[in-house]
């Protein structure tokens, strides 16, 4: 009973985090994100695109911002990322369906999109398997900072290299 209760709380936390993470974070940091080709995860609805891309990982290539209020919502051009390989064909996905894939390996390049260091880029220098706070070397300042894991998304450049 206690385990089920804990899992329910953890599930609610994750869902709350994703529901509070608007697609605008991609728009705000699109220049830094596009340049580093971050890996994102599609978290949409089965109603959208018949659910074919749900939970797929992809690389952000470009972002299209609506010109006026009558245009469709902001969308991202992405290439699927499977088994460490970028697909050659692309898909257009509304930014609201894209969420970060959090870093988990030393040396991974990250973009921080929330918190006091938002907009900065860094490299993971220390991480524990259960850590919620990760030590990141901020590239701009070359200083080590503690950053909450859910505040950053990984970038392809160093992830599998």
Name each model-derived stretch.
Residues 1-12, 70:
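Eukaryotic Ser/Thr/Pro-rich intrinsically disordered, low-complexity regulatory regions
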Residues 3, 20-27, 35-90, 106-154:
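Basic/aromatic-rich interaction segments and small domains that mediate binding to polyanionic partners
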Residues 13-21:
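Basic, amphipathic alpha-helix used for nucleic-acid engagement in HTH/winged-helix/SANT-Myb modules
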């Amino acid at each position: 009973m206690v385990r089920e209760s804990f899992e329910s709380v953890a599930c609610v936390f994750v869902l709350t985090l994703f529901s509070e993470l608007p697609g605008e974070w991609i728009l705000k940091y699109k220049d830094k994100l596009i340049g580093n080709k971050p890996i994102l995860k599609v978290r949409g609805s089965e109603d959208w695109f018949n659910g074919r891309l749900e939970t797929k990982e992809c690389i952000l290539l470009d972002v299209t911002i609506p010109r006026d209020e009558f245009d469709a919502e902001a969308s991202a051009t992405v290439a699927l990322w499977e088994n460490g390989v970028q697909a050659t064909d692309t898909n257009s996905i509304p930014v609201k369906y894209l969420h970060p894939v959090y870093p988990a390996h030393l040396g991974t390049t990250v973009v921080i999109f929330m918190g006091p260091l938002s907009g900065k880029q860094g490299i993971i220098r220390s991480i524990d398997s259960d850590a919620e706070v990760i030590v990141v070397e901020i590239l701009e300042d070359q200083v080590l900072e503690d950053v909450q894991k859910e505040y950053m998304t990984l970038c392809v450049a160093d992830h599998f290299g």
